[in-house]
C-alpha cells in the first residue's frame, strides 16, 4: 500500500511541475483505457473462479444492500453537515428552458451509455476467464497490481495537472473540507448495518463500502491487499462486491445529482456522487443553470475522497 500512496503523491507533484512548465496533459483517454484493462483483468479473475460464479446472485443482492445503505448514509450525513454549520440550500442560478430540458435528458442518456461500457468489459473478461481464452496467470493479482500502479500514476498526474486546482484550493475553507468527512462517516456507518444481515464480517463490509464510487481503484486494491490474507478466491469475491457497490453508486448519482442540484440540495448531490463529484457527475452539479458556488465544493470533495480511498483501504484491509 505504501507503494501505491507513494506513486500517487509523486505523480501529483509531477503533474503540477509539468503544468508550471506550460504543458497541459490530456489524460482522459489514457485513464479510460487503463480502467478498461483493469476491469477486464478483474473479470478474468472472476471467470476463472467457479465458486464465485455460483454465488453471483447472492453477491448481487449484498452489493445492492450495502450500496443503498451507503448512499442513504451519505445523503443523511450531508444534511446533518448542512444543519450543524447552518448552511442554506444553494439557490438555482437560472430557470431551465424546455429545449435545455431535452438536451439534459440526452446528455444523461449518453453518460449512462458510457457507464454501461464497464459492465460489458467486465462480462467480456469473465467469459474469457471462464472459457480459458487467456493464460490463467493474466488473472493473478500481480498482473492487476502492475496495471493498478499505472492507473494510480495517471490519476496523480491528472490531479496535479488540473489548471483550476490552484484556484479551487484558494477557495477552500474549513467548512468545505468537512463535507467529505461527513460523506465518509455517513457512508461507513450505514454500510456497517449490512454486517447484521449479510455473511460478511464488519471489517469486510466496511472495506467494500469504502470506495465512494471509485470502482476501478477500490476493487483492485482490495484484491491485491486481501489475496495474501484470505486467499485469492475470497479476495476476488470481496473485490467483486466492491466493484458492484461502486458501479451502483455511480449510476444512481448520474440520475439523481442533477435534480438534487437544481432543487438547491447541492451538498446532498455532492455527497451522493462521492469521488465522481469531481469528474463524471461534475456536469450534473455545475452547469450554466446552477450556482458557480457548486464547483469548489464538488471538486474539493472529489479530490479529498479520491486520496482517502487508498488510505482507508490500507487500514481496513
Predicted regions and their residues:
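Transmembrane alpha-helices that form the ion-translocation and gating core
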Residues: 10-11, 15, 62-97, 177-228, ...
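Structural signature of hydrophobic alpha-helical transmembrane segments
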Residues: 1-12, 32-33, 37, 62-73, ...
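Hydrophobic core segments of alpha-helical transmembrane domains in multi-pass membrane transport
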Residues: 7-17, 38-45, 69-79, 118-131, ...
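Intrinsically disordered, low-complexity non-transmembrane regions of multi-pass membrane transporters
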Residues: 23-25, 82-120, 279
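Alpha-helical membrane segments and immediately flanking helix-loop junctions
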Residues: 43, 48, 94-97, 204-252, ...
Amino acid at each position: 500500500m505504501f507503494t501505491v500512496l507513494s506513486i500517487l503523491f509523486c505523480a501529483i507533484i509531477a503533474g503540477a511541475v509539468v503544468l508550471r512548465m506550460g504543458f497541459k496533459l490530456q489524460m482522459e483517454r489514457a485513464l479510460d483505457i487503463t480502467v478498461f484493462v483493469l476491469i477486464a483483468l478483474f473479470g478474468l479473475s472472476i471467470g476463472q473462479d467457479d465458486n464465485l460464479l455460483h454465488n453471483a446472485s447472492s453477491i448481487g443482492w449484498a452489493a445492492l444492500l450495502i450500496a443503498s445503505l451507503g448512499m442513504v448514509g451519505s445523503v443523511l450525513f450531508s444534511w446533518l453537515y448542512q444543519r450543524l454549520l447552518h448552511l442554506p440550500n444553494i439557490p438555482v442560478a437560472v430557470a431551465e428552458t424546455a429545449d435545455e430540458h431535452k438536451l439534459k435528458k440526452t446528455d444523461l442518456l449518453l453518460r449512462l451509455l458510457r457507464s454501461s461500457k464497464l459492465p460489458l468489459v467486465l462480462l467480456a473478461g469473465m467469459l474469457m476467464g471462464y472459457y480459458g481464452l487467456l493464460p490463467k496467470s493474466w488473472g493473478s493479482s500481480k498482473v492487476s497490481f502492475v496495471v493498478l500502479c499505472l492507473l494510480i500514476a495517471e490519476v496523480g498526474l491528472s490531479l496535479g495537472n488540473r489548471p483550476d486546482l490552484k484556484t479551487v484550493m484558494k477557495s477552500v475553507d474549513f467548512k468545505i473540507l468537512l463535507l467529505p468527512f461527513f460523506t465518509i462517516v455517513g457512508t461507513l456507518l450505514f454500510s456497517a448495518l449490512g454486517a447484521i444481515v449479510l455473511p460478511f464480517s464488519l471489517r469486510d463490509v466496511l472495506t467494500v463500502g469504502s470506495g465512494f464510487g471509485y470502482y476501478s481503484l477500490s476493487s483492485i486494491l482490495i484484491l491485491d491487499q486481501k489475496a495474501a490474507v484470505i486467499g485469492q478466491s475470497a479476495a476476488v469475491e470481496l473485490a467483486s462486491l466492491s466493484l458492484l457497490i461502486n458501479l451502483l453508486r455511480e449510476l444512481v448519482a448520474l440520475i439523481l445529482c442533477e435534480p438534487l442540484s437544481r432543487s438547491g440540495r447541492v451538498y446532498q448531490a455532492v455527497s451522493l456522487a462521492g469521488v465522481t463529484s469531481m469528474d463524471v457527475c461534475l456536469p450534473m452539479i455545475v452547469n450554466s443553470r446552477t450556482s458557480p458556488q457548486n464547483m469548489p465544493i464538488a471538486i474539493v470533495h472529489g479530490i479529498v475522497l479520491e486520496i482517502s480511498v487508498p488510505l482507508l483501504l490500507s487500514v481496513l484491509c
